[in-house]
A protein has these predicted regions:
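Negatively charged, low-complexity tracts enriched in Asp/Glu with abundant Ser/Thr
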Residues: 1-33, 57-61
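Intrinsically disordered, low-complexity coil/linker segments enriched for acidic/polar
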Residues: 2, 43, 48, 71-72
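Short, low-complexity interaction segments enriched in Ser/Thr/Pro/Gly
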Residues: 5-6, 41, 81
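Compositionally biased, intrinsically disordered/low-complexity regions enriched for serine, proline
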Residues: 16, 39, 44, 66-67, ...
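Long, continuous compositionally biased terminal/linker segments
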Residues: 31-63
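Mixed-charge, Lys/Arg-enriched low-complexity segments
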Residues: 53-92
Length: 92
């Protein structure tokens, strides 16, 4: 399985995984609208650790780091809830 496959399955209310956007770091992107997105980048040399970058407009608004094991549905669900909570200030 692709190391980012489980991250692509994150269910974050109001945000949608965008399969058309990627970068050289292997990041995946979730969009809310044209100017707001969440980039999830795997941390090199640290398996299952990801950098979540919230971008508003053209500026990085917040950077979060979390461990998300690929075979742990509870960890995936908890991560989605945590990220959703962190995204709330940027949704107005």
């Amino acid at each position: 399985m692709d190391s980012m496959e489980h991250i692509k399955k994150l269910k974050i209310e109001g945000w949608v995984y965008n399969p058309d956007v990627e970068d050289k770091l292997g990041s995946v992107y979730f969009d809310r609208d044209e100017d707001n997105y969440l980039r999830v980048t795997p941390l090199k040399n640290n398996p299952n650790t990801y950098i979540f970058t919230i971008t508003q407009g053209c500026e990085d608004a917040e950077i979060l780091i979390s461990v998300v094991p690929p075979d742990d549905e509870l960890a995936l669900s908890n991560t989605a809830l945590w990220i959703k909570k962190e995204l709330q200030p940027y949704e107005s």
